[in-house]
Amino acid sequence: MPILRLLFASLVLSLIVPHSAIALEESAMVKMLKQVDDRQKNNGDYKSLVYIERKERDKETVVFEVAVYRRDEKDKLMILFLKPKAEAGKGYLRLNKNLFMYDPTVGRWERRTERERIGGTDSRRKDFDQSRLAEEFTPAYAGEEKLGRFEAYRLKLKVKPGVDVAYPVIHMWLDKKTGNVLKFQEEALSGRLMRTTYYPKWNRLYSESKGEYVYFPKQINIYDEVEKGNSTLIVMRKVDLNSLPENIFTKAWLESKSR
């Protein structure tokens, strides 16, 4: 009889424990990360016209316009500054997992790290590139939370050994309904919070080369957690999934845009 009562109590307890207390298996979390990556990846090329607004405490707001080019199958990325005039022709090129910056005023290329502030803003290379979460991070379950009107999974991502990223730890909020990323909080190795990023709007575009929709954040809001009061707004104004010229991802091509 005591055994029956114990079994009954265990059954009742399992029914009243909230679903949020049930941790996700690592395989399920990896699958979620792969889905995020796959939905943002295009089998062909990718081009976007991007508006960037940089706000710094006690300084005037600065607005940039850049063109972003991607060839996801070959891990290639180019960021070309179009406006303002003083920045036009400046650019970044990622080849073989190395990031280079070109300054047309001196005609020189310099290698940059993943911590590079793109154009001096709060953005990083990864904010414009394809998502590689499953490839670069190992997930751990941190629970379920309400984020505004959204029900979200919260995961803690730690960088895998030997992988070069801007920040080694990311706290990630993933919309349970849509699978879209809602929020990132990025930490230094010391545990210090460095950036908070929100993704309030997502969009999608059908890709002929992929045969599926490609998802992209329509808007990104980045807040500097070290220099309080500094923030960056990124808006994807136009996305094109048609093929790009074969030689576009070269230093010579980018240099030609400043002549």
Positions of predicted regions on the chain:
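Bacterial N-terminal signal peptides
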Residues: 7-18
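Positively charged n-region of N-terminal signal peptides that target proteins for export
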Residues: 1-5
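N-terminal, post-signal-peptide region of Sec/Tat-exported proteins
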Residues: 44-78
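Gly/Pro-enriched, hydrophobic low-complexity segments
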Residues: 132, 150-251
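Flexible, processing/modification-adjacent segments and terminal tails
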Residues: 24-45, 51-52, 60-62, 85-86, ...
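N-terminal post-signal-peptidase region of extra-cytosolic proteins
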Residues: 79-85
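Signal peptide processing junction and immediate N-terminal pro/mature segment
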Residues: 19-23
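Short amphipathic beta-strand and strand-loop transition segments with alternating hydrophobic
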Residues: 68-69, 140-146, 200-207
